[in-house]
Swiss-Prot record:
Pfam families: Ribosomal_L12 (PF00542), Ribosomal_L12_N (PF16320)
Species assigned in the record: Pelobacter propionicus (strain DSM 2379 / NBRC 103807 / OttBd1)
Keywords: Ribonucleoprotein, Ribosomal protein
InterPro entries linked to this entry: Ribosomal_bL12 (IPR000206), Ribosomal_bL12_C (IPR013823), Ribosomal_bL12_C/ClpS-like (IPR014719), Ribosomal_bL12_oligo (IPR008932), Ribosomal_bL12_oligo_N_sf (IPR036235)
Gene (UniProt): rplL
Highest taxon in the source lineage: Bacteria
Quaternary structure annotation from Swiss-Prot or TrEMBL: Homodimer. Part of the ribosomal stalk of the 50S ribosomal subunit. Forms a multimeric L10(L12)X complex, where L10 forms an elongated spine to which 2 to 4 L12 dimers bind in a sequential fashion. Binds GTP-bound translation factors.
CC terms in the record's Gene Ontology section: cytosolic large ribosomal subunit
Protein name: Large ribosomal subunit protein bL12
GO biological process, alphabetically ordered: translation
Family affiliation: Belongs to the bacterial ribosomal protein bL12 family.
Functional summary from the UniProt entry: Forms part of the ribosomal stalk which helps the ribosome interact with GTP-bound translation factors. Is thus essential for accurate translation.
Length: 127
C-alpha cells in the first residue's frame, strides 16, 4: 500500500475550492481545539509599535462578502467569475455570507472585485 506524502496532501488541498477549504479549516480547528486566527498583538509596546505599523503598508487584501443583498443571482454570477467556482460552490459561498471571496490579493484586484460585487448588489468589505 502506497504511503501518502506531504506533497500528496498539498496537491490535494491545492485542488479544493474556497468553500471546501473553509470547511476543512473549521473541522481541523474543532478536531484539534485550535484557532487559525492570527494572535492579537499585545498593545503594551507603546507608540513605537503604532508608528511601525503605519509605516508598513499592507500589500495583501481579503475580499469579504458580508451579504448578498436583494439580487442574489447576479452576486452568484460575479462570485463564479471572480473565483472560478462551480455554480453550487458559488451559491453556497453566497448563501453562507459572511465569507471570503478572495484572499491574499493585491489592492487593485481587491478593489476590482469589490466594485463588481457591489454593482451586482452585494455588501462587501475589503480587509
Amino acid at each position: 500500500m502506497a504511503e501518502i506524502t506531504k506533497q500528496d496532501v498539498i496537491e490535494y488541498i491545492e485542488k479544493m475550492s474556497v468553500l471546501e477549504l473553509s470547511e476543512l479549516v473549521k473541522e481541523l480547528e474543532e478536531k484539534f481545539g485550535v484557532s487559525a486566527a492570527a494572535p492579537v498583538a499585545v498593545a503594551a509596546a507603546g507608540p513605537a509599535t503604532a508608528d511601525a505599523a503605519a509605516a508598513e503598508e499592507k500589500t495583501e487584501f481579503d475580499v469579504i462578502l458580508k451579504a448578498a443583498g436583494a439580487n442574489k443571482i447576479n452576486v452568484i454570477k460575479v462570485v463564479r467569475a471572480l473565483t472560478s467556482l462551480g455554480l453550487k460552490e458559488a451559491k453556497d459561498l453566497v448563501d453562507g455570507a459572511p465569507g471570503a471571496v478572495k484572499t491574499g490579493v493585491s489592492k487593485q484586484e481587491a478593489e476590482d472585485a469589490q466594485k463588481q460585487l457591489v454593482e451586482a448588489g452585494a455588501e462587501v468589505e475589503v480587509k
